[in-house]
């Protein structure tokens, strides 16, 4: 059992494992909570015939999305299909128009404080 340090390293190692054994490689993602409020996520790629087990553990919630993308990509590899390229986001250009300068409006009435004279 090997714990890998980064998500990218886990992806490359599990991808090569899935390419070598596409029918028998399994991927699991578990979320654990402890009483001491230590929450963590474990991703595991396991191939039973050879006994190869790759693990990645993190306590960062932002990496959950990355791990789900990895699971999606590995499903393509296990079925023998190519991983589709990520769609590029289209940037729609809008013409720049000049904005009119805002004319200062009259100050609201009653907002001035009355001046008081000196007390004797």
UniProtKB/Swiss-Prot annotation:
Residues 110-120 have a biased composition (Basic residues). One of its GO terms (biological process) is SRP-dependent cotranslational protein targeting to membrane. GO terms for molecular function: 7S RNA binding. It holds the Pfam family SRP9-21. Residues 79-120 are annotated as: Disordered. One of its GO terms (cellular component) is nucleolus. It comes from the Eukaryota. This is Uncharacterized protein C17H9.07. It comes from Schizosaccharomyces pombe (strain 972 / ATCC 24843) (Fission yeast).
